[in-house]
Structures are given as structure tokens and as C-alpha cells.
Amino acid sequence: MDFEEAEDINGIRFAWNAFPSTKVEAGKVVVPTGALYTPLKQREDLPIAAYDPIYCSNQSCKSILNPYCAVDPNGFWRCPLCQYRNPLPAHYHGLNPENLPLELQSTSSTIEYITARPVQNPPIFTFVIDLCQDEDNLQALIEDIIVSFNYLPPNALIGLITFGTMIQVHDLGSDKINKSYIFRGDKEYTDKQISEMLNRPISTQLMQQQQQQPGQMNPQLANSLTRFFLPLEDVEFQLTSILENLSKDPWAVANGARPLRSTGSALNIAVNLLGLTYPGFGARVMLFAAGPCTLNPGMIVGNQLKEPIRSHSDIDKDNAKHFKKATKLYENIAAKAVKNCHTVDIFAGCYDQIGMLEMKNLCNLTGGTLLLTDAFTTSIFKRSFLRLFNKDDEGYLLMGFNGNLEVRTSKELKISGLIGNASSLQVKSANVSENELGLGGSSSYRLCSTSPRHTYAVFFDVVNNQQLPPNAQSYIQFITHYQHSSGTYRVRVTTVSNFLTSDEQTLTNSFDQEAAAVLMARITLFKAEQDDGADVLRWVDRMLIRLCQKFADYRKDQQESFRLGPQFQLYPQFIYYLRRSQFLQVFNNSPDETAFYRHVLLVEDTNNSLIMIQPTLTSFTLDGEPEAVLLDSVSIKDDRILLLDTFFHILIFHGKTISQWRKANYQDLPEYSNFKELLEFPKKEAAELLHDRYPLPRFIDTEEGGSQARFLYSKLNPSVTYNTNDFIGGGGAGGGAIVLTDDVSLQVFMSHLQKLVVSGSS
């Protein structure tokens, strides 16, 4: 079975599909023993059991019955992780290979249990809308929010908060008039203050009236915080009316000033109010922001336009005066959301930065969406926002709420940590390693929200010190508890087994260079959040050199003898493109753009992450089939159309000759129908790529000499530049385009790598 087939079945990709057998050997392989796991990966033939799982009785294990368990005729099963002998339930007695229960069948390495415990509340959605924006942008946003009601379950609880200079919490339980409560935008309210201001006691007299007048609104709704979150089917008309009557914030904006925007206080109120009302139940706070917060708490920039918003350089030099204070506020709000299992989504609809860098942990720790768009009027926002509410074949939302991921291992392994959109629950079980990588010190992680897209990097420590027999196996079990949008609690269980080997050839053959590159990219991003950028790049280079010294074939000090086997051949170029990517080279990006790009890489699976690291390039010509070509400047030819997929952008580039023919409208002439077809091919291919991608990529149609061709040139390996010999000698015209850059080419990078490897340097 190849790596992608295994991923299709279990949603998991390992860097090493066989593990080093001892701690010493594991320390020499450079790339950590890790896995990329997608708990809710969609699978048509997923085994589903409509009963509760059977757990191992060993309190320090608590793994779940799975196909790797040995079952004896006396009604016992042996746990492969801890070797504990457990009694089977009475109705499982007398098992044989022909009548195995679902969870013991070989096809059930991944299985989902629908437990008997019902969810007490439906999912909750709170819309937090910025009113400091122009009318067109605001109206487009309101239209999309109203459309989204068609995608939500009718019993979903809905809340609404709007903000500008002041904050309005809308009371949806008031059926006669539209009622809202006003809060100051420049004050940080505690949950106690919010409760005292909004939560009125239920009077005995009112309760008696309720009993005498059946059919009237429940006093619980009229007099408690639950009146701010009501079923969509009950309040849709009123909510739509409120939204349609929203208008731009009336607070005057002086010349040379930014609007007074209270994003920080509005988010604080939304998260606290949900925490007071529905702690421990699936909920999303959806922020729609059209500019930076200009009021404390949470100020990103002052309201005077003469004060520029912070840049990467300002942050690096500690010149961003609001940065640390704002970051601390949003981290505190994120901690409250995590405690209550609530998710925060942030949608930006403006050219301005809104403060995503400061707010990123609101999404990164809660599994929320971070989406950067130029305006709420764009199709990128509209289609991406509505895709968040995609449904499965049964009509249920493809999102899991209020989840947690538990990782169980056999005795040879311990958990080093996790990197992804989750938060640690600090469960220090016996299988937790002292060597932390990412969010360490725990075997259990909170997933406030998860989906079929959410992928988590989990790292392991090989702790075995003894020589093992041939074909010794280790076992890992991932247990994901979550609240399904159908109103049930579910448990998704994936159990996998890996050989432990001391044979270097077996280890080499088990190496998945694609998964390894993505895992190393995640570690690199984790380091980039804490360390200096130059130090991170040096670390990346050292790791690559050490890996090649361990697994390449070469003779000392003979560069031409350097060879990498097929399992490692692509890995150096993945690292080359990672070094050049927007994830690490932040010079041309704002802090908000960097936060957005990094957030998406921490969510996606192996294939999508690889596209972000090393984009794909496809060539279309008149006399051949579409083919993948090198991501290199030599691939640009006059008679070619190129399709570039960077995940965030889909770009169609027309070569010089193709562009001239297109401008001459040859495609409109009957005798050039083949040229018309050529122009359509890449558009069809692009449409397929756009179909399921989240967030929706920006589509660019450009040509040789076009201003937006820079998006293509910036991604290409500059094998021909303005200062190479080819260019100086007049070459390059037939051998690709000239790239005006001082960046090192892949060929030079590989030459330096080989030189350092064979010299024994690190």
C-alpha cells in the first residue's frame, strides 16, 4: 500500500512509515518521527457503529477495541498498546473470524462511533459585525450573512452583536420592538460585569403569570442571558429585519483620522457572553472586520492617520507600541474561548490590516477560520464564507464542535507534542515525553472546532533502549471525541501499527519525503513564531545538511560523487522552495498576510501544504497534451500557456506569441478553433481547482509583460537571471525567461548543499 492509499483510509501520513527501533537510532535520523493526521477525513466507506466503544480497563491506557486486538475464545481481548487482558461484553462471547463485530474487522482501522449520549444544545453561531465601513461593503456582507441562514440547521441558536465606536448586543427575545444593549467601546468588561448588566432575575410574579398564560414566551428567555441566543427558525424574520436595517456607524470621523473601532471590546463581550450562557457546548463567534481596532482594549493602531500601522520591521525592532498589549488581550480572550470549547472565526474585508497577527491565536487555538480578503463585495469572501457551511450527503454541516483528540501509544513510543489548530489540555499521562516539540507535555488536545480539512502534526519520541526482535511493531491510537451537527456525540478512532527496525535500508524505503517536508515546515513555522528569522533559516539548512550526510551516498570531499536515493530526491527542493516561500520570507508581506498564510499551512493536509510550499506548474501547447513542467524560469516559452497553482492564487500565464494571437482575436476565427480550445483548456483546469478549495484562491489571468506576471516570476526557480552567464552572453531567449532577482537558484543551492555534505560540515 502506498502512502496516499494509507492516507485515504486512515487520514494519516508518517514521515517514517517504519520507526527506528531505539532512542539512539531515532536521534540520528534528523527528521522527527511524526504524523500528519486528519481526524474527520471524508471516506465513503467509513465504518459507522451506532453504539458506544469498548475501552481497555487499564486506567493508564484506556485505548479502544480495534482490529489489532487479539481475541480469545474465553471472552477476553488483549490490548495491543498495553498488553492488558480485558473481558469482552457478554454479547461478544463466541466470536469467530466469520462473525466479528464491526470494530474488530480488518477494514475498521478507522471507525466512527455514534454514542448514546445526546447533545443538550444545538450549535450556536454569534455574528459580530463591524459597522465602520462603507455602505456597499456593509450591504454585501449583510446579504451574505442572510444567505448563510439557509445553510444553518433550523434549530441553530443565533446571536448578533454589532460594533463601531460603541457596541450593541441585540436582544432577539424581544418580539415587539428591536431591543439592544449598548456598551462602551473603550472599556474591557469582565464576565461578572456583563452578567450584572444583562442578566435580570426571574421574578416569582412573572413565573406565576407564565403558568397562568400558556403559550407566552418563557420567562427564562425574557429574563436571562439565553434570550441573546435563540433558534434561527424562531427569529429568522426578526433577525433579517435587524440586519437589513443596519447602517454605517453614525459616529463622525474627523479628517485625517481613522474610525473609532472597538473590535477588542466587542470580541471580549461576545466570548464572555457565550461563556456565561453555553459553556462546554459547540459555538462559533464570527467576526467580520473592515479595519483595525483603534480603541483600547485591543488597539492595533491609533485613530490618527499620521500614525502608520505596524510593519514586520517595527515588530522586530520593538517599535510597535500597541503590539504586545493588544496581543495579550486577544490571547486572554482566546484562553476563555478554549476553556468553554468555543471557536472564533475572523473575516477581514478591507485593504487595511485589521490586526490578524495580534488576533491569530483566537483562531489558531480554537480551530477557527482566518480569512483575508480585499472587501466583503468580492467573490473570494462570498464563496469562501458560504463554503464554511458545506454539508455532507445527509445534509449535516461538515464541522465538528467541542472536540478533543487523545493520543495513545504502545510502550516503545511517547508523545512529544502537536502542531496545528488546537490547544493543549495538559494531560500528563505515562506516554508523554519530556522532549517537547510544538504543544508538548500532554497526550490530549482540545479541538474547539474541527472539519474534514483540519490536519494536525503529531510528533513521537522513540523511548525503547533494548534491541527488539525482527518485525517488532509499535501501535498508535488517535481518539477524537466531538459534537456532530446532527445533535449526537461521536468518537472517531484510528489505530495504526508501524514496524520498528534497526535496518537502515528498511528505514530508507519507509521515508515519505512529502509528509516529511510538511512536518518540517510546521516545525519551522512553530520556531519562526519564537525565534529570529535568520536563526530559523540556519536551523532549516542544518537539518537538511545532516539528513543528507546520513542518507546520501558520497565519497568524502568529492562533490561529483553525491547521490540521493529516490526516497529523498525531492526533499532538498521542497526545503529550497520552503526557504523562499512567503511563510519565511516576509519582506513583501504585511504582518496580517503572514499570519493568514501561516494559519492556512497549519490547517491543511499533505498535498495542499505541498502546493503552498512548492506550487505546481502545468503547460498547455497547441501540439501536445497538458503536462506538468518544472517550476523554473526555463518553462516560460512564447508558444505556451502556463497554469500556476500556489494554493492561494490560480494564475494563467500566456506566452508572448499566444498573447499576440489572443489580442488579434484569432480565437474568433473558425479556422483557428484549435487555438480557441487551447485558450479554454487552462480555464477549465482552473475551474476544477477552484471548485473545492478553501479559502477560494485569487484568480489571475495575465501574459508576458503583464503587471501581474510578477506572481509567477516570484515563484519560479531563477535558473536564468540578469547576472548569469547565459544572459550576459545573449542566451536565455530560447531557454526561458530572464528573472530579475538576486535569489540563489535551485542549482546553486544544490551545489552548495553537496559541497557542505561531502566536506563533513554542518
Swiss-Prot record:
Keywords: Cytoplasm, Cytoplasmic vesicle, Endoplasmic reticulum, ER-Golgi transport, Golgi apparatus, Membrane, Metal-binding, Protein transport, Transport, Zinc
Source organism of this protein record: Candida albicans (strain SC5314 / ATCC MYA-2876) (Yeast)
Subcellular location: Cytoplasm; Cytoplasmic vesicle, COPII-coated vesicle membrane; Endoplasmic reticulum membrane; Golgi apparatus membrane
Family: Belongs to the SEC23/SEC24 family. SEC23 subfamily.
The protein's role, per its UniProt record: Component of the coat protein complex II (COPII) which promotes the formation of transport vesicles from the endoplasmic reticulum (ER). The coat has two main functions, the physical deformation of the endoplasmic reticulum membrane into vesicles and the selection of cargo molecules.
Protein name as catalogued: Protein transport protein SEC23
InterPro entries membership: ADF-H/Gelsolin-like_dom_sf (IPR029006), Gelsolin-like_dom (IPR007123), Gelsolin-like_dom_sf (IPR036180), Sec23 (IPR037364), Sec23/24_helical_dom (IPR006900), Sec23/24_helical_dom_sf (IPR036175), Sec23/24_trunk_dom (IPR006896), Sec23_24_beta_S (IPR012990)
Disulfide bonds: none
